[in-house]
Regions:
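Short, glycine/polar-rich helix-capping loops at beta-to-alpha or helix-loop-helix junctions
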Residues: 128-138
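Conserved N-terminal substructure of TIR/SEFIR domains
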Residues: 1-72, 82-84
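TIR-domain catalytic/interaction hotspot
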Residues: 67-110, 162-165
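Short beta-strand/turn micro-motifs composed of small residues
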Residues: 10-12, 123-127
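Arginine/glycine-rich "motif VI" loop of SF2 helicases in the C-terminal RecA-like domain
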Residues: 109-119
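Conserved beta-strand termini and adjacent loop/short-helix elements that scaffold enzyme active sites
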Residues: 64-68, 124, 147-149
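C-terminal interaction surface of TIR/SEFIR-family domains
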Residues: 137-192
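Hydrophobic/aromatic beta-strand patches that form the interior of the parallel beta-sheet core
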Residues: 91, 120-124, 145
Length: 192
């Protein structure tokens, strides 16, 4: 079975007690970031499974998705770096340029310079809250896909024709073809 690991990095919202502006009562995920990333990954998995099972009905493939977070008891950055080094991709929601998300993005960009097969970096942002002039120039060449929030039913859709889904589907299809190419090359060399 082929398992493709993808992590998502997005801001968490802090809830503060109304009477006391400094007492944090809870943190919770940003539901729109969560919905955008999960929706894209579900669609990628559906498309890839449909495509590979046309050629090979017995083919098994799965996407393992988790939010990017540290493991309890470990130094936070080491844990995040380790997860990124084992992933196919990390999707960063840079809406609002959250400091933790931007720090994690910096780690991913540094790993791209030092790993043989670094995780692909995909950036997403809520279109209504994204200000292109605030995007650091060093990120201008990276893939960025904006999503919109339908406030009537709290759904999320990407406004760029699903380019994130198409790009990830294409990349994963190439990855899944690679073991078959390597096997074919071995068989060809053995018979030469």
């Amino acid at each position: 079975m082929h398992i493709i690991k993808i992590f998502g990095a997005y801001p968490w919202q802090v809830e503060v007690e109304p009477e006391s502006h400094d007492h944090i009562t809870a943190t919770k995920r940003n539901e729109f970031s969560y919905t955008a990333i999960n929706g894209a990954i579900d669609e990628v998995e559906r498309r890839v499974k449909s495509s590979i099972q046309k050629d090979n009905p017995d083919a098994q493939f799965s996407i393992f998705y988790s939010r990017l977070r540290a493991t309890s008891g470990n130094f936070v950055l080491d844990s995040i770096r380790e997860r990124m080094s084992k992933a196919y991709a990390v999707i960063f929601d840079i809406t609002g340029f959250n400091k933790n998300v931007m720090l994690e993005l910096g780690i991913a960009l540094e790993l791209q310079r030092h790993l043989e097969k670094p995780a692909k970096v995909f950036l997403i942002s809520c279109a209504e809250q994204f200000e292109p002039s605030l995007l650091p120039s060093d990120l201008s060449g990276y893939f960025l896909s904006c999503y919109q929030i339908n406030e009537k039913d709290n759904t999320v859709c990407f406004k760029d024709g699903n380019s994130l889904v198409m790009r990830m589907t294409s990349d994963i299809m190439e990855i899944l073809k690679q073991p078959y190419r390597e096997e074919l090359e071995k068989n060809t060399q053995a018979h030469a």
